[in-house]
Amino acid sequence: MQFIDEVKIHVQSGHGGAGCVSFRREKFIPFGGPNGGDGGRGGDVIFRVDSNLSTLLDLRYRPHLKAGSGKNGMGKDRHGAGGEDLVIPVPPGTIIKDAETGEILADLVTAGEEIVLLKGGRGGQGNARFATSTNRAPKFAQPGEPEEQRWLRLELKLLADVGLLGFPNVGKSSFITRVSAARPKIADYPFTTLKPNLGVVPYKNYRSFVIADIPGIIEGASEGAGLGHRFLKHVERTTVLLHVLDLSWMPDRDPIREYEALNRELALFSPELADKRQIVVVNKMDLPAVRENLPAVLPWFRERGLAVFPLSAATGEGISPLLDEIARSLWGKDEEEW
C-alpha cells in the first residue's frame, strides 16, 4: 500500500433543514391553526481514529467531503430528519491543521478517539412554533442554519517509542528486521527504504516497544537533499533515538563526521528532536573491518558521555544488551529489575 502522510481536504457540514409553513386542513375545520414542523439538523464532520489504518491514502483521492443536510419540516407537525454525520477515519498520530493559518485543531493518537470539527447547521423552526395570542396563524417559518466549511491539512506522525536514524546503507532496515516482525526492503544500495517502517519489538516479561525506521538522512537534507528530511517528523514523538553507524567504509567515510552532520540536520529540523536521548549503535560487527576500526572511534563518543553498542544485525551479536538499554531509557529499568 502506498504510504501517504500528508493530504489537503475540504470538509463541509450539513445545512440545516427549513421549517415548514403549514395549517391544519381537516373536515369541519377549514381554518385550522399552524402545524408546520421543524427542519432537521445538518450532519456534523467527525474525525475518528481507526487503529487499522496506517496511511492517509484514502483521503488523497477524496479531497472534497460533505456531511448530509437536514430535511425540511413538513405539515402535521412532522419534523425533518437530521442529516447524516460525516465520519472520517484517520490513522493514529494524525494532526489536523487549518490549511490557511496552520493552526493545529486536533492531534489524534488513541484508537477510537474522535473530535467533532464542524457542526451541522440547526434546523429552522416551523410556523407552529410562532403562534401567539395575537398571531394565531403565522405565515412564516425559519430557514435552516447554513453549513460550516473549511480547508484542512492532515499530517500523519507515526507513533513509536524508538526512532532509528542514520545515513543510507548503515543497516537500519536489517536491524529492524532482526528485532521485530517488520520486513522492509533490504538491498546494498542507498535509499532502499523509501517510506517509514514500524516494527513491534518483543521484550521480556511480555513487554514490547515500537521502533520506527525512516529513510536515511544525508547532509543537506534540511535544504531538500535526499529523502529522509520529510520523514523526520515520524520520530518526533519518540522517547529515544538509535543512531546507527557503519565503520566498514573507513577511512573513505568518517563515521564521526557523519554523526555530527546528521545531528546538525536534526537541529535544523527541530531543536527538540536534536535534544532527545541518543544511543549510538555500531552495526556490521560481523565484518572484520568494523571490528578493526571500532577502537578508533570509541574514545570520541565516551568522552561525550554517549553509550555505544556494537552489534551485528546479520548475526544477532550484541542485540540483547542494546534492548536492555532501550528498556532502561523507556521504562527506567530493564528486565532484571522488574
UniProtKB/Swiss-Prot annotation:
An essential GTPase which binds GTP, GDP and possibly (p)ppGpp with moderate affinity, with high nucleotide exchange rates and a fairly low GTP hydrolysis rate. Plays a role in control of the cell cycle, stress response, ribosome biogenesis and in those bacteria that undergo differentiation, in morphogenesis control. GO terms for biological process: ribosome biogenesis. Belongs to the TRAFAC class OBG-HflX-like GTPase superfamily. OBG GTPase family. Keywords: Cytoplasm, GTP-binding, Hydrolase, Magnesium, Metal-binding, Nucleotide-binding. SUPFAM superfamilies: Obg GTP-binding protein N-terminal domain, P-loop containing nucleoside triphosphate hydrolases. It comes from Geobacter sulfurreducens (strain ATCC 51573 / DSM 12127 / PCA). It is an enzyme of class 3 (hydrolase). Mg(2+) binds at residues 173, 193. Its EC number is 3.6.5.-. This is GTPase Obg. GTP binds at residues 166-173, 191-195, 213-216, 283-286, 312-314. Its main location: cytoplasm. One of its GO terms (molecular function) is GTP binding. Its cofactor is Mg(2+).
